Amino acid sequence: MSSSHTPMMQQYLRIKTDYPDMLLFYRMGDFYELFFDDAKRASQLLDLTLTHRGQSADKPIPMAGVPYHAVENYLARLLKKGESVAICEQIGDPATSKGPVERQVTRIITPGTVTDEALLDARKDNILLAIHTQKQKIGIAWVDLGGGRFHLQELTEEHQLNAELVRLQPAELLCKESTPLPSFCSNFAVKFRPGWEFDASNAHKLLCEQFSVTDLSAFGEQNYPTALIAAGALLAYLKTTQKQSLPHLTTLTLEQSEDYLQLDASTQKHLELFENIHGGGEHCLLSILDKTACAMGSRLLKRWLGKPLKQHAIIQTRQQAIKEIIFLQQDVSLHQLIKQCADVERIVSRIALKSARPRDLVSLLQTLTLLPAIHDELQENKSLLINEIKKEISPLPLLQQLLETAIIDNPPMLIRDGGVIAPGFDEELDELRNLSSNAHETLVKLEQEEKNRTGLSTLKLGYNSVQGFYIELSKAQAQNAPPHFHRKQTLKNVERYITPELKLFEDKVLSAQSKALAREKWLYDNLLEEIQQYIPELSDLAKSLAQLDVLVTLAERAQSLNWNCPNLVPESGIMIQAGRHPVIEPLLQERFIANDLELKPNQNMLLITGPNMGGKSTYMRQTALIVLLSHIGSFVPADEVTLGPLDRIFTRIGASDDLSSGRSTFMVEMTETAQILRQATSQSLVLIDEIGRGTSTYDGMALAYASCAFLASTIKAYTLFSTHYLELTELPKEFSCIRNVHLQASIKTGQIVFLYRVEEGCANRSYGLEVAELAGIPKEVLKLAHEHLNQIQDTQSILVQTQIIKPPTSPVLTELKKIDPDRLTAKEALDLIYKLKHLECAESIN
């Protein structure tokens, strides 16, 4: 460090060395300043003016700054860009400091560890995720620090990792330095951490300390070592950034794929669960479902959608709770009560991290006062799940009383502003406040007492910022000043004195405000520590309120949208009567055309044909969405649904280039198809829409035929397979498990009319030119297209006929199959040769 730097800059550089990868916000008066490369980067990211302060190596030192009172807005913008920030505060007193004011980093904010309300999306989990790979295993661990959840999982394939990242959308990824990552990880803020943080023994030590155990057998130490290393690395990072204990992280939850209906990354995207195809939040499944009353419920609903359950028994407990809420007509009253509840989940996390603000505690108190009303509203409910919820939302009278006596009703935003602790809570604080606020009255009282005691009529008490408090006497009466008056200042006409009593009063008054603030801060910290003992009960309360909110919301959606409860049965199959699309139907002005569907083990595939825009993709997607909704416990848009056991949903719908990975549309399509063909089982629901379009007609049709046949006869998955290759409609003749259906359309007055009804049999034409006309293709182009189509149909179709799928058997081969060579005599063999020669000649002529 150069000695030419000022002491302040030397201090800055010392602190900055500990945070090389973070932007250091260095407090100087009313601003947070940034220097050197931090200043350049911040000026670009935040559009700040870049100035200079001092020099380093004969060059001006770049500087940029933000006002301290507006720092939260700037932090939010930086976090969205994936940046991490270290906040360095002045902790010394400028008035008494010799040299630079003492400073230290008091707060580290990273995208995955932020818990401040102002910096978070209230309706979205904020996830920090760590990845570790070893021995063909991918271990992942993730934490929602604001929600107190800590999970781990072990994977075997990169596509599984991609699916989890798409589902969780982590704000920050941790991995070991120099670890190669798949291209899809580039969409996230990645932090490379030192290798020792991914050490097995270090992970074991940290995790045992966190959960107060001697071994990790309960968390699967033997079976999931890679995931536990990731969990340990994640915990090490949290310890570094939070600089304190994490009492709200009390358990580590192992997620196992066999417990959930699996949705790969493509399926989550194609079904538009959380965002539409353009990346927006409107017109997706979540936007239709999420009418939750509180942020906790909204976040939980999204987690349910991302991880549909497989166990019918658990799903049915949710169904029973929803049925009961509907029957008792509780959805409106409960919604209104829950709407008044605070985000208890995140408040608990801030209490655990000692970063809860005064208004957090007031919001928590308001929620506690609502619990008796919510509990009373649920008195008639008898379903298993609601009974469990009732147990967790019982009142907490001692905590409620503590908060009522400790905090005023409308406190300031920050404890540093004072005026948070209620009068009467602490005698010493009340005295300090009285000294500060009643100084004038006390001064008048002291003056009168001294006059009475001394009999000096000119005696006055005064104050100025230089001399402090003083007793003033005229020159005439000064000679009568009592011995305990100590001269402080001599002026032309008066003498000023101080007494031990007045000095004591001065010390108390002048320091009362700062002492009151310090006392209040101490009391507030102690209050947070006292509330921490209620973290288990408050965490359970938060989970139960969120769960109740989701159940009430699903009950309201079922009634408002005319949805019905699906039947989950052990027998295999999928049956949907009058199914509708859950997203499209509410958006339509006209009536949605409902359609039936039935898939069973001996008839497990529907081969769907029909025109573009005729509703094939809608029919397929609504089937998958009805299945998915059934597996979160929701009612569904259908008159009746019966579902047997299912393990996965796969989709291959639509495609576009993957420019980041250098993959063409056809390559994306084939990659997704390959994953389906390798991973699907007889209990999977598979949607395949138009494969083979990105290559030649012959290759495309051959791939479509082979994929269709393999799914139907080898995998035997429940499959909806749409195609424009009409030649494929011959497949049911070869495979009895395949059924042809089509979406109806007709031509009226020269215009195509889509009927959107699914009918038995195959379409007899594709209506491609009619759809092109609707799209606005110029008439001269359409005329030329019609002429060319007629020429093709009159001569030879560019599409190979059915023989491509099942070529006609050669007469020669047919005859050869009949022969048993061991039984032929010499004469019969000679006759056969002539016969085959004759057949071959006839075949070549044809």
UniProtKB/Swiss-Prot annotation:
InterPro entries, A to Z: DNA_mismatch_repair_MutS, DNA_mismatch_repair_MutS-lik_N, DNA_mismatch_repair_MutS/MSH, DNA_mismatch_repair_MutS_C, DNA_mismatch_repair_MutS_clamp, DNA_mismatch_repair_MutS_core, DNA_mismatch_repair_MutS_N, DNA_mismatch_repair_MutS_sf
Residue numbers binding ATP: G610, P611, N612, M613, G614, G615, K616, S617
Domain of life: Bacteria
Record-level Gene Ontology MF annotations: ATP binding; ATP-dependent DNA damage sensor activity; damaged DNA binding; mismatched DNA binding
Keyword Coiled coil: no
Source species: Legionella pneumophila (strain Paris)
Keywords: ATP-binding, DNA damage, DNA repair, DNA-binding, Nucleotide-binding
Protein task: This protein is involved in the repair of mismatches in DNA. It is possible that it carries out the mismatch recognition step. This protein has a weak ATPase activity.
GO terms, biological process: mismatch repair
Protein name: DNA mismatch repair protein MutS
Keyword Lipid metabolism: no
